[in-house]
């Protein structure tokens, strides 16, 4: 079977991570895969903020959990690295572009033997002044919409089995 298709079929959302940080090289490869995602008109409207700083990671988790309405929950399931995708609000394809970046990164993580999961609420986080200030501090100017968090780390335990694919989701016109 083709390696890319195999990765697509085998990748799962992971909800239990080891605390060990993935290597910088692995994270760089995952980010690079995200940067190669297709984008509308080749605009490359998405940016990635790679968070390996534990203090910031924990602050993001706290904010995300509050937005979720579960203040005592770790929405990143213990993953030590958080790759945040944001997209330029002025680009009409921003959400789609950012979504493809997320997909590429999750597939890349799987291909490197790491687990990942897409965690929402980045939109709400980056509407807050403290996270807009973080972007400004990083030199990211303009209006940005949070697309998602790609939580990445080593899987703690076994990856879940694939759910059965639902029927009646493909309609051929020949």
Predicted regions, residues:
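Acidic, surface-exposed loops and disordered segments
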Residues: 1-174
